[in-house]
């Protein structure tokens, strides 16, 4: 568990042997979450286990049976619904990261800030408009003070990285054979050139890239980091303090997801989770379109966080959030 004054994570977290241990732990805990994911249609119904518990609780006749789940149909439905949801506001992000549009804004960065970011970027607009959430007051202040030129430059850098990644780094024939996080080539996204602290942090910038190209970019959301905490069974693996996926707010004395967690490491674990999901899909004769690779991963992460939402709320003492988890999800 990390103080807000500490580094994003301990040095051991970048060690390949450590990463292999984390992946092994994820593998051990994956199956029950996947079964629940499919049996409940990603949380839209109850699982067989939950059905039996309700029967016991209310003394219902054991002759009443829950319909068996067609795993193949359920996974297909989950994937299609996830894509449909993903696409709803995707065009807004594609327009935001359009290189020609960004070039035009170089003549008027203030317009970029007030129009493209404030009014047209869904996650930023939603955050700024959510005035009931007092914990977002600081974000609103930081956005108001943010320099338009620097904001534009960060988004231009993200756009350039996002549009050039497939050409520079991605080989679809060898992608699933990658073993080291370094070979995913995401380390630049953890640098200052791709961050505007307080306004465009790990959550927002990875959402932008995820919406641009979910074939290669995973979304490092609040739910995703929490889900890795649970997929590793809350274990402390090699670290001196506590789980690398948690952070302690010293001033408020509350536990949150590690919103400083390096994207280059997160991308590796999201990649490994995709491989597990893809293997299950093959067993069920379900095709997961690689162009939407990380959409199914995000849906899985969201489901795990939903399962544990009561405990997460108790740990973080935060108000329930809407949409993308506006708040400390990585600004």
Can you say where each PLM-predicted feature lies in the sequence?
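Short, small-residue alpha-helix embedded
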Residues: 204-210
């Amino acid at each position: 568990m990390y103080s807000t004054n500490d580094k994003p994570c301990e040095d051991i977290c970048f060690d390949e042997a450590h990463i292999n241990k984390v992946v092994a732990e994820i593998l051990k805990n994956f199956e029950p979450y996947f079964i629940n994911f499919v049996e409940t249609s990603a949380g839209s119904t109850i699982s067989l286990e939950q059905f039996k518990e309700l029967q016991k609780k209310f003394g219902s006749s054991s002759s009443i049976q829950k319909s068996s789940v067609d795993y193949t149909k359920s996974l297909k439905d989950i994937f299609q619904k996830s894509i449909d949801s993903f696409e709803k506001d995707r065009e807004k992000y594609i327009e935001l990261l359009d290189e020609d549009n960004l070039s035009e804004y170089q003549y008027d960065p203030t317009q970029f800030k007030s129009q493209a970011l404030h009014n047209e970027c869904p996650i930023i607009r939603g955050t700024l408009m959510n005035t009931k959430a007092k914990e977002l007051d600081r974000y609103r202040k930081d956005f108001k003070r943010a320099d338009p030129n620097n904001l534009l430059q960060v988004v231009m850098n993200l756009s350039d990285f996002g549009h050039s990644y497939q050409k520079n780094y991605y080989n679809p024939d060898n992608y699933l054979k990658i073993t080291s996080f370094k070979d995913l080539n995401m380390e630049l996204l953890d640098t200052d050139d791709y961050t505007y602290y307080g306004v465009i942090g790990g959550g927002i910038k990875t959402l932008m890239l995820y919406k641009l190209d979910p074939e290669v970019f995973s979304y490092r959301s609040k739910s995703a980091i929490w889900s890795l905490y649970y997929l590793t069974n809350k274990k402390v693996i090699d670290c001196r303090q506590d789980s690398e996926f948690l952070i302690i707010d010293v001033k408020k004395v509350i536990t949150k997801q590690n919103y400083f967690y390096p994207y280059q490491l997160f991308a590796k674990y999201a990649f490994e989770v995709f491989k597990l999901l893809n293997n299950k899909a093959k067993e069920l004769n379900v095709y997961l379109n690689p162009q939407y690779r990380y959409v199914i991963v995000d849906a899985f992460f969201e489901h795990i966080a939903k399962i544990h939402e009561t405990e997460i709320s108790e740990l973080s003492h935060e108000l329930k959030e809407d949409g993308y988890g506006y708040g400390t999800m990585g600004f």
